[in-house]
Amino acid sequence: MTVRIGVVGPGGMGRAHIDRITGELAGGAVVAVHDIDEVNARRVAEPIGAKVFGSATELVASDAVDAVLVASDGTAHLEPVLAAVAAGKPVLCEKPLAPTAAECEQVMAAEVAAGRRLVTIGFMRRFDASYLAMKAVLDGGELGEALLVHCRHRNPSAREAYRATMAITDTAIHEIDAMRWLLGEEIARVRVDVGKSTRNRFGHQIDPLTLLLETISGVRVDVEVFVNARYGYDVQCELVLETGVVSLGDQSVVSRRDASGARHRITSDHNDRFHAAFNAEVQHWISAVAAGGGAAGDGAGGAASASASTAWDGYAAAVVCDAGVRSLAAVLGGEDDGAGRVDAGGWVPVSLAQRPALYA
């Protein structure tokens, strides 16, 4: 079976997914696209013979579309995701699932009403070979339990439209989900620290900043977010265990040593660094849909994959992000956020709704 895929948002990340589905992966074909920029939609659709739709809901409703991939701006995710669930069609949604935790709850409610999981979130680090190897060491238990995690997320530059809060909601959200998945537990509280900012930023940006997470069992995670680092796209993670340390390797094929010294290439962006992970994630989703599943690895395709994410994961990440944004607001304002939710140390508790049985 060839899965007929409709893509909402075929620019940037969406275009990268179209290219991988068309040129690298098996079992899927992009047959429909929708973009608010109709010129771009036609530019992308014409070479692959896809149909251009005037709205996301029209695309989702089409009998020619089996499954939907949503890669539009995060503020526009909710409508096509809810439409896909209502139509009983599997949907792979890039992060975030929706702009707010309340909207993520709408998606979960729709899935619960439908009685099946149809939504997969694009948290590709769960499919990255380095993160998978790190999780295997932790889960194996040979080095004891996790105590601390040190994360670094550095980008070459951020566009002017990148707001201070996006360091949490658009960038650190990947670390937030990766830590929930890696450590196998929820995050209990969040704190944001800010200090000196780089000169290489737009004036409204706070860069770098540090996000501190504490899990239910007490594991401390520090996340450095530096989106105007200039030198490249650099994601690092060090897991401190009771009798050892596990770190992500340098993401290079080769290292070079010559008269000028030793060096290796730094990746340029997320598509460069996580290309293989993106491929594995999307292939997993296509294969699950082809096998009769809804969410990746769910349903007729077999047991749910340990790497595949759900609407619950999208919701949980959104709640943590909301807490981080409140902490940042308190730090910048120098006072409580007005709702009594920030303690004297700047920590904001994370309060999750009861997990529906569908996501157990």
UniProtKB/Swiss-Prot annotation:
It catalyses: myo-inositol + NAD(+) = scyllo-inosose + NADH + H(+). Transmembrane segments: none annotated. InterPro entries: Gfo-Idh-MocA_inositol_DH, Gfo/Idh/MocA-like_OxRdtase_N, GFO_IDH_MocA-like_dom, MI/DCI_dehydrogenase, NAD(P)-bd_dom_sf. Its EC number is 1.1.1.18. Keywords: NAD, Oxidoreductase. GO terms for molecular function: inositol 2-dehydrogenase (NAD+) activity; nucleotide binding. GO terms for biological process: inositol catabolic process. Gene3D superfamilies: Dihydrodipicolinate Reductase, domain 2 (3.30.360.10), NAD(P)-binding Rossmann-like Domain (3.40.50.720). Pfam families: GFO_IDH_MocA (PF01408), GFO_IDH_MocA_C3 (PF22725). The keyword Oxidoreductase applies. SUPFAM superfamilies: Glyceraldehyde-3-phosphate dehydrogenase-like, C-terminal domain (SSF55347), NAD(P)-binding Rossmann-fold domains (SSF51735). The keyword NAD applies. Belongs to the Gfo/Idh/MocA family. Homotetramer. Involved in the oxidation of myo-inositol (MI) to 2-keto-myo-inositol (2KMI or 2-inosose). This is Inositol 2-dehydrogenase. It comes from Beutenbergia cavernae (strain ATCC BAA-8 / DSM 12333 / CCUG 43141 / JCM 11478 / NBRC 16432 / NCIMB 13614 / HKI 0122). The gene is iolG.
